[in-house]
Amino acid sequence: MINPVYVAIDTTEAARAIALAERLKGQVGGFKLGLEYFTANGPAGMEAVSGLGMPLFVDLKLHDIPNTVAAAMKGVVRLGAAITTIHASGGAAMIRAAVDAANDEAAKLGIAPPAVVAVTVLTSLDQAGAEQVGFERPVLDQVKRLATLAQDSGAAGIVCSPLEVEAVRALCGPDFKLVIPGIRPAWSEAGDQKRFLTPAEARAKGADVLVIGRPITAAADPAEAAGRIKAELGL
């Protein structure tokens, strides 16, 4: 079984990110780097981590007009991303533009395109928080609506919380990639995640990729923490 765990390395320090990645290579499936890291270190910082030979999840959550997102996506492909994110709420045209740009640029470079996955509702939002930003329907209904939009528009999958995995899997079928942040082992603190499950629970419900950050990166021994999660998953 392929290790589904991608470690969220949330830092501005390239040296720390590289050191963590080198330490965790044998215990995880890949590394996720986001805006915090990218704005501090740029493409060179991303390439320093991807150069270690592990799959890279470039989590920039692109959300703009279709032409702008398409142009940005070409740059993401050049970073060697295996997975990358856009916002589903950008709409069908934006999603299609992102997917087309990823495929076109990858073909030019002779590499596999990244899986373009669409963020639905941020896992830091509970129902009250979702209502504050204008979601009039329950979070689950909003996630399902955006998942259908993303799938119909060509996205490879979505990002949603573990609590929506089962419903989205039933709605979108077995081949739609479900990338799940908000994963917290039972022995770790919840932090700022409002909608979370343990790694084993999320996998049992149909999650494909488990994004785990501080339970690993903030542990006294990150490799030991990652190995503990790996064992819990039966890997």
Curated annotation (Swiss-Prot):
It holds the Pfam family OMPdecase. It is an enzyme of class 4 (lyase). Substrate binds at residues 10, 32, 59-68, 123, 184, 193, 213-214. One of its GO terms (cellular component) is cytosol. Pathway: Pyrimidine metabolism; UMP biosynthesis via de novo pathway; UMP from orotate: step 2/2. SUPFAM superfamilies: Ribulose-phoshate binding barrel. GO terms for molecular function: orotidine-5'-phosphate decarboxylase activity. Signal peptide: none annotated. It catalyses: orotidine 5'-phosphate + H(+) = UMP + CO2. Coiled coil: none annotated. Keywords: Decarboxylase, Lyase, Pyrimidine biosynthesis. One of its GO terms (biological process) is 'de novo' pyrimidine nucleobase biosynthetic process. Its EC number is 4.1.1.23. Homodimer. Belongs to the OMP decarboxylase family. Type 1 subfamily. Catalyzes the decarboxylation of orotidine 5'-monophosphate (OMP) to uridine 5'-monophosphate (UMP). This is Orotidine 5'-phosphate decarboxylase. It comes from Paramagnetospirillum magneticum (strain ATCC 700264 / AMB-1) (Magnetospirillum magneticum).
